Regions:
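Hydrophobic, well-ordered beta-alpha structural blocks that scaffold small-molecule cofactor pockets
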Residues: 1-121
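Histidine-anchored nucleotide/phosphate-binding helix
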Residues: 32-34, 140-163, 337, 341
Length: 476
């Protein structure tokens, strides 16, 4: 049969019979591995991944990134959907002794048809799949983002409202714990699979309905005859959905698709939550999704002895979180954050400042308490009781907003119209904004500025004014 690959291995850059390491065990890495298994073009020695310990065993070993020092290989192929972290990762690999010319990256391209043998199905083992249960079975394929899992819960809930007697499996790379945390109140959730894409590729056609949810929506498979057996109205809606997605007419590399999509939605008045409405199938009218709290963490939160009143801040974008060099264009500059904390403590010495983020995040001087790499259930409680959360556009903003905490959000490359919440205080400055996906990745400024104007123009003083107005009850 033929399968379509958005992420075609960079054959033109890697000589045949090379020994390669794939950096990144998510969707792209799994597609590269599958292509190498089918074609025998290269030998995959190993995966390396920052979150190596979150993946189930694979047919090739997976190691932490530092292991490249001891592995024998010819090339390292970066398996990223977007170029957001390419520069940072390349720099890290070079520091580990990997020559720049042995580090290979290519962005996603237009879909390419590859011939796949009929026996290329993934071994499903003894997994508990929704298609083995009575009723309508649905598979949803997610990406790896914390905030994305929150936003996509809205679509999950909409599907359940259309067909209450469905069971839904979610496939996601490395964030099953996050999804369980956010969806534990959903009785229609059957299972969550930590999957980089290989398992989904082998299973999605067995479901009554399979959808890929990114910034856009794709109908990968739909069995109308079976859907009609259970719910004729739902079957007709899903048929309409597939036709609408097919007629959307977005071609070319994924980065180009997203940029065009964002601007189409701007003209239609839709955003990250409401964009499915363009299909005529959904009627999403708000941004609200439920975020359950694990009661077992309440006592732990109460024992933290945090200041009676506090604000929360976040700095960092994944692999760049341990650096002050602001290698991610959408990051509010580290120097600005430190200056803001200084201004805030001078004005509100009695109010604490709590820093949240990943374990490797660099600490901001002047902060009263650090919770870096903490359990997500505990972070929920901390965010919920924060007076206000200061951040760039990202996952913690989605979480804090759904928990009812006001956020002051610094917007630059990412589009406020698409990713912003009207109830938050969304800040923009300078003369250009919204270039995200004009180029591939968050680390790229469309004007090639070392200090992107959009983010550097949002001064600590301005953020301080907004915080002060909000805390004094003068703000929106």
């Amino acid at each position: 049969m033929y399968d379509k690959y958005t992420y075609l291995f960079p054959y033109e850059k890697v000589p045949q019979d090379s020994r390669i390491i794939i950096y990144g065990a998510g969707d792209v890495g799994q597609e590269y591995l599958q292509q190498m298994e089918i074609t025998g073009y290269c030998e995959v020695v190993a995966f390396v991944d920052k979150a190596y310990d979150k993946y189930a065993p694979m047919i090739v070993p997976i190691y932490p990134v530092d292991s490249v020092r001891s592995l024998s290989f010819d090339y390292i192929v970066l398996a990223f959907k977007m170029g957001a972290h390419v520069r940072t990762v390349t720099k890290k690999l070079m520091e580990l002794g990997v020559p720049n010319d042995l580090i290979i990256y290519i962005e996603s391209r237009k879909e390419v048809d590859l011939f796949i043998s009929e026996n290329g199905d993934t071994d499903s083992g003894q997994c508990d799949f929704a298609y083995n249960r009575p009723g309508i079975s649905i598979a949803l394929k997610y990406g790896p983002g914390l905030g994305d899992a929150i936003v996509k819960k809205k679509i999950f809930m909409e599907l359940v409202s259309m067909e209450p007697n469905c069971y839904i499996d979610i496939y996601c790379p490395g964030i099953s714990t996050v999804v369980h945390s956010f969806y534990s109140d959903q009785k229609n959730l059957n299972n969550v699979f930590d999957d980089g894409g290989a398992l989904y590729a082998g299973q999605f056609k067995k479901y009554d309905l399979s959808l890929t949810l990114s910034f856009m929506m794709e109908v990968d498979s739909a069995s109308y005859e079976r859907l009609k057996e259970y719910n004729i109205e739902f079957a007709e809606k899903m048929k309409k959905l597939q036709e609408a997605c097919s007629n959307y007419h977005l071609t070319g590399a994924g980065v180009i698709q997203r940029y065009v999509h964002f601007h189409r939605m701007k003209f239609l008045g839709f955003d990250y939550y409401t964009y499915p409405n363009y299909t005529g199938v959904f009627d999403i009218i708000d941004h609200k999704v439920t975020i359950p709290l694990d009661a077992s963490f309440k006592e732990m939160f109460q024992k933290l002895a945090l200041p009676g009143q506090y604000i929360t801040i976040n700095y960092g974008g994944g692999v760049a979180a341990n650096s002050t060099n602001n290698e991610i264009a959408k990051e509010w500059p580290f120097a600005h954050i430190e200056k803001f904390v200084k201004l805030f403590k001078e004005r509100y010495p009695q109010v604490g400042v709590v820093q949240l983020g990943s374990a490797e995040t660099i600490k901001v001087v002047g902060v009263d308490a650090f919770f870096l790499g903490e359990n997500l259930e505990l972070v929920k409680y901390i965010l919920r009781d924060s007076l206000v959360h200061i951040d760039k556009e990202g996952g913690l903003v989605h979480l804090a907003t759904q928990l009812g905490t006001k956020c002051i959000v610094c917007f630059g490359p990412t589009q406020e119209e698409y990713f912003g919440y009207p109830e938050n205080i969304n800040l923009k400055a300078g003369n250009c904004h919204g270039c995200h996906c004009l180029y591939d990745g968050f680390d790229v400024c469309a004007r090639s500025m070392e200090q992107p104007e959009c983010m550097w123009s949002i001064t600590p003083e301005r953020v301080m004014r907004e915080v002060e107005e909000y805390l004094n009850g003068e703000s929106r």
